[in-house]
Amino acid sequence: MPLPKDVQFVTFDCYGTLIDWETGVYEAFQKEADRDGFTIDRDVLVPRFIEIQREIQSGSYELYAEVLRRTAVRVAEELGWPLESSRAQFLPNSVPRWMPFRETNAQLERFAKKFEMGILANVDDKLLGATRRHLRGDLDLVVTAQQVRSYKPDPAHFRECARRIEKKKSKWVHIASGYPTDIEPCLQAKVAVIWVNRHATELEPGQRKPTEEVKSFREAGKLLNPA
């Protein structure tokens, strides 16, 4: 399906699209591991973090802060770093220090002049509140995992967004970096979606193409707001 000709509502995934969570997680792990003289390999950390977090999120719902604590302990164990569970709070405590990508705020300001905006985030309300202090532009809608009690790729975020924006659904575009978490459920729900493919990930056989694919959030902005 093509992008709507008259886009009115634009939503974003937050972490990975607006916020550089990979750097934030790596720096948090390394800072805590420094206490034990342990070195973290970022290239090993990030894929294991994604895999383990996704597994935990697929179980019974719990607040994202708890997901992070559990993920921290399991990832550390796999890396050979003996982290006691009592120290795992370092990871949710680091979320307020996860910073936006360089182009994020300039693009949000441009979007805000033309569209209504929202965030659909796999996070709890408290942690997103801390993150929003780094983001410019007013939001017309926020849907968190805490509100719908599930994590993407479960479709609850997108169903709730569609319910709230009502008649604007046909003029809604979602922008996200996560293919499994955001692109696939959008395609299933027939929501126009722009994939911010920062790592030049190649689609696997059987995976459907997004409505549009770009390399950065800035390029996504040019697609919707070329002026």
Language model features by range: what are they?
Residues 1-10, 109, 115-227:
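Asp-based, Mg2+/Mn2+-dependent phosphohydrolase catalytic module
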Residues 3-102, 124, 128:
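N-terminal helical cap/lid subdomain that shapes the substrate entry/recognition surface
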Residues 31, 74, 106, 160, ...:
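Surface-exposed charge patches
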Residues 66-71, 106, 156, 215:
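Generic recognition of short, well-ordered alpha-helical interface segments
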Residues 95-111, 117-120:
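Hydrophobic, well-structured mid-protein blocks that either form specific transmembrane helices
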